[in-house]
Protein backbone atom coordinates (compact mmCIF):
# COMPACT_ATOMS: atom_id res chain seq x y z
CA UNK A 1 0.00 0.00 0.00
CA UNK A 2 2.69 2.52 0.99
CA UNK A 3 4.69 1.78 -2.16
CA UNK A 4 1.82 3.19 -4.21
CA UNK A 5 -0.04 5.57 -1.89
CA UNK A 6 2.96 7.56 -0.62
CA UNK A 7 4.42 8.39 -4.04
CA UNK A 8 1.02 9.56 -5.30
CA UNK A 9 0.53 11.65 -2.14
CA UNK A 10 3.97 13.24 -2.57
CA UNK A 11 3.30 14.01 -6.23
CA UNK A 12 0.03 15.72 -5.33
CA UNK A 13 1.87 17.79 -2.73
CA UNK A 14 4.09 19.24 -5.42
CA UNK A 15 6.47 16.55 -6.54
CA UNK A 16 8.73 15.93 -3.56
CA UNK A 17 11.17 13.32 -4.82
CA UNK A 18 10.33 10.35 -2.65
CA UNK A 19 9.93 6.67 -3.42
CA UNK A 20 7.37 4.35 -1.84
CA UNK A 21 7.40 2.74 1.57
CA UNK A 22 10.49 1.65 3.42
CA UNK A 23 12.17 -1.68 2.85
CA UNK A 24 12.25 -3.96 5.88
CA UNK A 25 15.74 -4.92 7.03
CA UNK A 26 16.31 -7.70 9.52
CA UNK A 27 18.73 -5.72 11.65
CA UNK A 28 19.29 -8.52 14.15
CA UNK A 29 21.08 -10.45 11.38
CA UNK A 30 23.60 -7.65 10.90
CA UNK A 31 26.21 -7.89 13.63
CA UNK A 32 28.06 -4.62 13.17
CA UNK A 33 26.49 -1.31 14.14
CA UNK A 34 28.54 0.31 11.40
CA UNK A 35 27.09 -2.05 8.79
CA UNK A 36 23.57 -1.29 10.03
CA UNK A 37 24.28 2.40 9.56
CA UNK A 38 25.87 1.79 6.17
CA UNK A 39 22.78 -0.09 4.99
CA UNK A 40 20.59 2.82 6.03
CA UNK A 41 22.91 5.25 4.28
CA UNK A 42 22.73 3.29 1.01
CA UNK A 43 19.41 4.81 -0.12
CA UNK A 44 20.28 8.49 0.37
CA UNK A 45 23.78 7.85 -0.96
CA UNK A 46 22.39 6.31 -4.16
CA UNK A 47 20.13 9.36 -4.61
CA UNK A 48 23.14 11.63 -4.11
CA UNK A 49 25.29 9.68 -6.57
CA UNK A 50 22.50 9.79 -9.15
CA UNK A 51 22.19 13.56 -8.63
CA UNK A 52 25.95 13.96 -9.12
CA UNK A 53 25.82 11.92 -12.34
CA UNK A 54 22.94 14.08 -13.57
CA UNK A 55 24.92 17.20 -12.69
CA UNK A 56 27.92 15.92 -14.64
CA UNK A 57 25.73 15.07 -17.64
CA UNK A 58 24.12 18.51 -17.59
CA UNK A 59 27.45 20.28 -17.28
CA UNK A 60 29.78 18.26 -19.50
CA UNK A 61 27.64 16.71 -22.26
CA UNK A 62 27.29 19.61 -24.69
CA UNK A 63 25.72 17.55 -27.47
CA UNK A 64 22.74 16.43 -25.37
CA UNK A 65 19.38 17.14 -26.97
CA UNK A 66 18.16 20.42 -25.47
CA UNK A 67 14.66 19.01 -25.02
CA UNK A 68 15.98 16.73 -22.26
CA UNK A 69 17.52 19.51 -20.16
CA UNK A 70 14.37 20.57 -18.25
CA UNK A 71 13.49 16.99 -17.31
CA UNK A 72 17.04 16.10 -16.27
CA UNK A 73 17.38 19.32 -14.26
CA UNK A 74 14.09 18.68 -12.47
CA UNK A 75 15.09 15.06 -11.83
CA UNK A 76 18.34 16.24 -10.25
CA UNK A 77 16.39 18.50 -7.88
CA UNK A 78 14.06 15.60 -7.00
CA UNK A 79 17.08 13.45 -6.16
CA UNK A 80 18.52 16.14 -3.88
CA UNK A 81 15.13 16.56 -2.19
CA UNK A 82 15.04 12.79 -1.61
CA UNK A 83 18.51 12.89 -0.05
CA UNK A 84 17.65 15.70 2.35
CA UNK A 85 14.19 14.38 3.20
CA UNK A 86 15.43 10.86 3.90
CA UNK A 87 18.26 12.15 6.09
CA UNK A 88 15.82 13.66 8.61
CA UNK A 89 17.01 12.15 11.91
CA UNK A 90 13.58 10.93 13.04
CA UNK A 91 12.03 7.50 12.63
CA UNK A 92 11.14 6.08 10.12
CA UNK A 93 13.58 8.07 7.95
CA UNK A 94 17.02 6.83 6.96
CA UNK A 95 18.66 9.63 8.92
CA UNK A 96 17.35 8.09 12.12
CA UNK A 97 18.24 4.56 11.02
CA UNK A 98 21.83 5.69 10.44
CA UNK A 99 22.05 6.94 14.03
CA UNK A 100 19.87 4.28 15.67
CA UNK A 101 22.53 1.57 16.18
CA UNK A 102 24.59 4.01 18.25
CA UNK A 103 21.75 5.31 20.44
CA UNK A 104 21.23 4.18 24.01
CA UNK A 105 18.39 1.60 24.23
CA UNK A 106 16.29 3.97 26.37
CA UNK A 107 16.55 6.68 23.71
CA UNK A 108 15.62 4.18 20.99
CA UNK A 109 12.56 3.09 22.99
CA UNK A 110 11.43 6.71 23.32
CA UNK A 111 11.74 7.30 19.58
CA UNK A 112 10.08 3.97 18.75
CA UNK A 113 6.96 5.04 20.63
CA UNK A 114 6.34 7.67 17.96
CA UNK A 115 7.61 5.74 14.91
CA UNK A 116 4.14 5.34 13.39
CA UNK A 117 3.18 9.01 13.52
CA UNK A 118 6.47 10.79 12.94
CA UNK A 119 6.17 10.79 9.16
CA UNK A 120 2.76 12.44 9.40
CA UNK A 121 4.07 15.05 11.83
CA UNK A 122 6.94 15.84 9.47
CA UNK A 123 4.61 16.08 6.46
CA UNK A 124 2.22 18.35 8.38
CA UNK A 125 5.17 20.49 9.47
CA UNK A 126 6.27 20.80 5.83
CA UNK A 127 2.73 21.74 4.85
CA UNK A 128 1.83 24.16 7.68
CA UNK A 129 5.11 25.54 9.07
CA UNK A 130 6.65 27.79 6.43
CA UNK A 131 9.98 28.01 8.26
CA UNK A 132 10.47 24.25 7.97
CA UNK A 133 9.54 23.95 4.30
CA UNK A 134 11.55 27.10 3.49
CA UNK A 135 14.60 25.69 5.26
CA UNK A 136 14.24 22.37 3.41
CA UNK A 137 13.82 23.94 -0.03
CA UNK A 138 16.68 26.36 0.63
CA UNK A 139 18.88 23.32 1.30
CA UNK A 140 17.63 21.68 -1.90
CA UNK A 141 18.34 24.90 -3.79
CA UNK A 142 21.85 25.27 -2.35
CA UNK A 143 22.91 21.66 -2.97
CA UNK A 144 21.40 21.66 -6.46
CA UNK A 145 23.15 24.91 -7.30
CA UNK A 146 26.46 23.39 -6.20
CA UNK A 147 25.83 20.69 -8.81
CA UNK A 148 25.32 23.39 -11.44
CA UNK A 149 21.55 23.33 -11.86
CA UNK A 150 20.00 25.98 -14.07
CA UNK A 151 16.82 26.91 -12.17
CA UNK A 152 15.06 28.18 -15.27
CA UNK A 153 15.35 24.64 -16.63
CA UNK A 154 14.14 23.18 -13.31
CA UNK A 155 10.99 25.32 -13.44
CA UNK A 156 10.41 24.28 -17.05
CA UNK A 157 10.87 20.64 -16.02
CA UNK A 158 8.40 21.07 -13.15
CA UNK A 159 5.84 22.60 -15.50
CA UNK A 160 6.20 19.66 -17.89
CA UNK A 161 6.09 17.21 -15.00
CA UNK A 162 2.79 18.65 -13.77
CA UNK A 163 1.14 18.00 -17.12
CA UNK A 164 -2.32 17.81 -15.57
CA UNK A 165 -2.24 21.57 -14.95
CA UNK A 166 -1.63 22.46 -18.60
What are these regions (language model features)?
Residues 1-166:
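Hydrophobic transmembrane alpha-helices and their immediate loop junctions
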Amino acid sequence: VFSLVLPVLFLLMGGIGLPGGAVYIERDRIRSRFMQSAMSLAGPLSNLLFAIVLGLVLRFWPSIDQRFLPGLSFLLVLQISAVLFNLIPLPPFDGYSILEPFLHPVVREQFDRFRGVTIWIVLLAFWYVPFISDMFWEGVYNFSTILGVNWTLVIAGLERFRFWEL
